[in-house]
Swiss-Prot record:
Annotated region described as Disordered, given as residue ranges: 79-101
Keywords attached to this entry: ATP-binding, Ligase, Mitochondrion, Nucleotide-binding, Protein biosynthesis, Transit peptide
Annotated protein name in UniProt: Glutamyl-tRNA(Gln) amidotransferase subunit B, mitochondrial
UniProt organism field: Pyricularia oryzae (strain 70-15 / ATCC MYA-4617 / FGSC 8958)
Catalytic activity: L-glutamyl-tRNA(Gln) + L-glutamine + ATP + H2O = L-glutaminyl-tRNA(Gln) + L-glutamate + ADP + phosphate + H(+)
A matching Pfam family: GatB_N
Keyword Methyltransferase attached: no
Assigned protein family: Belongs to the GatB/GatE family. GatB subfamily.
GO cellular component terms, A-Z: glutamyl-tRNA(Gln) amidotransferase complex; mitochondrion
EC code: 6.3.5.-
Length: 654
C-alpha cells in the first residue's frame, strides 16, 4: 500500500471519509428488508459498519428511529429499573445488612479500578482531551484525535510526561512504593474500539507496588469487618498506567459508530489483593479510593460522571466450623464496568448467590467475564475468561523505560492536599458536622459540594464578623452557623432538584435543572447569595420559611436578575418585598399564650405535680402559632413564654 496523501488523511480524521483504494476499498452490502423478526426479543440485531462520521454535537449513545425524539437517558434508566423490579416483585429481598454473608460460605473479592488521570493530554499522542468540567459543550466526535490514536501505519507513541505527575500522586495517595524504573507492555486483543490491536499498559514493571487503603466503620464497611477500633486494611497490589479505548455509539438498527476522542486517554489501573469478604466493604473500598484520588488531585472525575469504573473478581468457597474447606480460593469470575458504588455491592451479591446456587446443585463455576445492568437481580455472561496467554503480553519496542527519581516522589508527597480521613475529622471536630453529613459532603459531585460548603461558610463568617460591635460573635455562634450551612447545603439545596420542584419548573415553562456544582465549588446559586440568606436566618432577621422561599425564588428564576449575585442584592429584595421578621413583643407573646390557655385550660391538669410533658407543651405552642401571626412568632421564644405561663397558672392552682 502506497503512502496516503495528506488530503485524504485529513479528510478521514476530520470527516470520517475513506477513499476507495487498495485495502480501504468499500464493498457495498446487499440491502435487506427489515421485518418484525429483526426486533424479536432475544434476537440480536445484525451489525453494520459505516465510514460516515456522526454529526457534530452528537453526544448520546443511541440513535432513535427517524422522526422520533431521542429518549432522555434518565428515563431509559428509570424504565429499565422499573422493569427489573417488576420481574423480581414476587421475590423476597433481604436487607443490605442481612446480605453481607451466607452461612457456610466465604466470599472473596478482588477489585480493579480504572480512573482517568487529571490531565488535558493523552498518554501517547499530542491530541488534547475534552474538558472534564464543561459537560455542557461536548466536543464533536472524532475531533480530538491524532494519527497515532487511529493506528495509522507509520505512527509511533510519544509518551506525554505531563501524565506522569497525576499518576505518581495517585500511587502516593494509595500508600504505594513508586518504582524507580517502570516500563510499558502491549496487551494484544482485537476489538473495534482498539484500532491498533493491542493496548499499551504496564504488566511486567508497573509504576507502583505494595500499597494499602485503610477502611473504618464510617467508610461504610460491613458490620462484620468492624472490630477492635483498628481499621480494616485492604492491600493494593499495584498501580499501572494504560490507555483508554474509543467510545462506541450504538444505534437501535445495529449500526455502531466510533468516537476516538477518548482513545488513548491516560488511565491508572488500581489492582487490589483479594482481601475483601463482604459486598458493602467492596463498595466502601471503591468509594474510599475515589476520595483519595480526588484529594490528591490525581483523578477529579468520579463514578458520577464516568471518570472511574470498577471491575470485580468474585469467588466463593465452603466454610465448615469456621474453617475454609480448601486453602485454595474458588474459581473466580469477573464482572466488568460497574459505574456506581451501589452497582459494585449489588453485582457482587448477585454473583455470589449465583455461584453458591450453582455449586449447591453440583455444578461447576466457569472462569468467565460477566456483566451487570442497573436494577438487575442476576449477572449475565459476556464471554469466556481470557487467560494471560491469550493476551500475549510483550514489552513495547517503541517505548523506553520510565525513570522516576525519589526526589520527585518526595516533592509530590510534600505538596499533597489534605487526605480524606484528616479532612473528615476536621469537619466533625471544628465544623460540628456529623460523620454522616461530612462524608456526604465529601462524596457529592466528586467533592464539589464540600468546596461549595467551604466557600459558603467563609462568606457567612465574614458577614458575621462585619455586622458590627453590637453583637459579639462567639465560637459557639460560629459552630452553629457552620452546622446550619451544612444542613442547608445537604438537605435544603437537595430539595431544589426534587421531582415536585422540577414539575413546578416544567409548569412554568422552565427546563429541568440540576444544582450545577463544579469540583471548584461553584453552582447556579452562588456561595455569596446563599451566605446572605443564611446570615439573615442565623441572626433571626428572617424566618426559616422565608429563607427557603428566597432560595427557591433564585433557583426557579422568579427573583429578578438585578437582585442576584450583586452586593446587598438579597437584602434589597427582602426589603422591597417586606419579608423581614418583625417579632412579637414580650407583652404580645404573653397575651397570646394567656389567650391560648384560656381556650385549652383543661390541659393544665397534665402539668400538675411538677410534670411537664413535652408533647402537651408543644401542642400549646402549636396553638399559639395557629392563633397568632405565624410570620411574627419565633417557635423557641413561644415555647419559653408558654412554659412560663403554664408554670404560673399551675402554681396558682395549688
Amino acid at each position: 500500500m502506497g503512502r496516503i496523501p495528506t488530503r485524504e488523511l485529513s479528510s478521514y480524521l476530520l470527516t470520517g471519509r475513506v477513499f476507495s483504494r487498495d485495502c480501504t476499498r468499500l464493498q457495498r452490502l446487499p440491502a435487506r428488508n427489515i421485518s418484525k423478526q429483526h426486533f424479536a426479543v432475544g434476537q440480536p440485531a445484525q451489525r453494520r459498519w459505516n465510514h460516515t462520521a456522526p454529526e457534530a454535537g452528537h453526544t448520546t449513545t443511541t440513535q432513535p428511529p427517524p422522526g422520533q425524539p431521542a429518549p432522555h437517558l434518565r428515563k431509559i434508566l428509570k424504565d429499565q429499573a422499573k422493569a427489573s423490579k417488576a420481574q423480581a416483585k414476587g421475590k423476597k429481598k433481604r436487607s443490605s445488612a442481612d446480605n453481607q454473608t451466607v452461612p457456610g460460605w466465604e466470599l472473596t473479592v478482588g477489585i480493579e479500578i480504572h480512573a482517568q488521570l487529571n490531565t488535558d493530554r493523552k498518554l501517547f499522542s499530542p491530541a488534547p482531551l475534552a474538558s472534564t468540567e464543561d459537560n455542557t459543550r461536548a466536543p464533536a466526535p472524532n475531533s480530538l484525535v491524532a494519527p497515532f490514536d487511529l493506528a495509522i501505519p507509520g505512527t509511533q507513541p510519544l509518551f506525554q510526561q505531563a501524565t506522569l505527575v497525576p499518576a505518581i500522586r495517585a500511587a502516593v495517595a494509595l500508600n504505594c512504593a513508586v518504582q524507580p524504573v517502570s516500563s510499558f507492555d502491549r496487551k494484544h486483543y482485537f476489538h473495534w474500539d482498539q484500532p491498533s490491536g493491542y493496548q499499551i499498559t504496564q504488566y511486567y514493571a508497573p509504576l507502583a507496588r505494595d500499597g494499602y487503603v485503610d477502611l473504618r466503620a464510617r467508610d461504610g464497611i460491613a458490620a462484620q469487618d468492624v472490630g477492635g477500633g483498628e481499621p480494616l486494611r485492604i492491600r493494593v497490589k499495584q498501580v499501572q498506567m494504560e490507555q483508554d479505548t474509543a467510545k462506541t455509539l450504538a444505534r437501535p438498527d445495529g449500526v455502531h459508530w466510533l468516537d476516538f476522542n477518548r482513545c488513548g486517554a491516560p488511565l491508572v489501573e488500581i489492582i487490589s489483593e483479594p482481601d475483601i469478604h463482604h459486598p458493602a466493604t467492596a463498595a466502601a473500598f471503591v468509594r474510599k479510593v475515589q476520595m483519595l484520588l480526588g484529594a490528591a488531585d490525581a483523578c477529579v472525575v468520579g463514578m458520577e460522571k464516568g471518570g472511574l469504573r470498577a471491575d470485580v473478581n468474585v469467588s466463593v468457597r465452603r466454610v465448615e466450623d469456621g474453617k475454609t474447606s480448601s486453602a485454595k480460593l474458588g474459581q473466580r469470575t469477573e464482572i466488568k464496568n460497574l459505574f456506581s458504588f451501589k452497582a459494585v455491592e449489588d453485582a457482587i451479591i448477585a454473583e455470589r448467590d449465583r455461584q453458591i446456587k450453582l455449586l449447591d446443585e453440583g455444578g461447576v463455576v466457569l472462569g468467565e467475564t460477566r456483566g451487570w445492568s442497573l436494577g438487575s437481580t442476576e449477572t449475565r455472561r459476556l464471554r469466556g475468561k481470557e487467560g494471560e496467554v491469550d493476551y500475549r503480553y510483550m514489552p513495547d519496542p517503541d517505548l523506553g523505560p520510565v525513570l522516576v527519581g525519589q526526589d520527585v516522589v518526595e516533592h509530590l508527597k510534600s505538596t499533597m492536599g489534605v487526605m480524606p480521613d484528616q479532612e473528615l475529622d476536621d469537619l466533625v471536630s471544628s465544623y460540628g458536622l456529623s460523620e454522616k453529613d461530612a462524608m456526604s459532603l465529601m462524596l457529592l459531585e466528586d467533592g464539589g459540594r464540600l468546596q461549595f460548603y467551604y466557600k459558603t461558610v467563609d462568606a457567612l463568617e465574614q458577614r458575621l464578623q462585619n455586622q458590627g460591635d453590637s453583637t459579639k460573635v462567639t465560637a459557639e455562634s460560629l459552630v452553629q452557623a457552620r452546622i446550619l450551612t451544612g444542613n442547608w447545603i445537604l438537605h435544603v439545596l437537595g430539595s431544589l432538584t426534587s421531582e415536585n420542584n422540577q414539575r413546578d419548573r416544567a409548569a412554568a415553562g422552565l427546563s429541568e435543572r440540576d444544582l450545577g456544582v463544579t469540583s471548584e465549588g461553584d453552582a447556579f446559586i452562588s456561595a455569596d447569595d446563599l451566605a446572605d440568606i443564611l446570615f439573615f436566618l442565623h441572626t433571626s432577621r428572617i424566618r426559616q420559611g422565608t429563607a427557603k422561599d428566597l432560595l427557591f425564588a433564585m433557583f426557579n428564576e422568579v427573583m429578578p436578575a438585578q437582585y442576584i449575585s450583586t452586593p446587598a442584592g438579597i437584602e434589597r429584595y427582602i426589603t422591597d418585598n417586606d419579608l423581614w421578621f418583625s417579632e412579637l413583643s414580650p407583652q404580645e407573646y404573653s397575651e397570646l399564650a394567656e389567650s391560648v390557655l384560656d381556650e385549652e385550660e383543661h390541659v393544665l391538669k397534665e402539668f400538675m405535680g411538677a410534670r411537664y410533658p413535652q408533647g402537651k407543651l408543644m401542642f400549646l405552642v402549636g396553638m399559639m402559632m395557629k392563633s397568632g401571626a405565624r410570620e411574627r412568632i419565633d417557635p423557641a421564644t413561644a415555647q419559653k413564654v408558654m412554659r412560663d405561663v403554664v408554670e404560673t397558672r399551675v402554681a396558682a392552682m395549688k
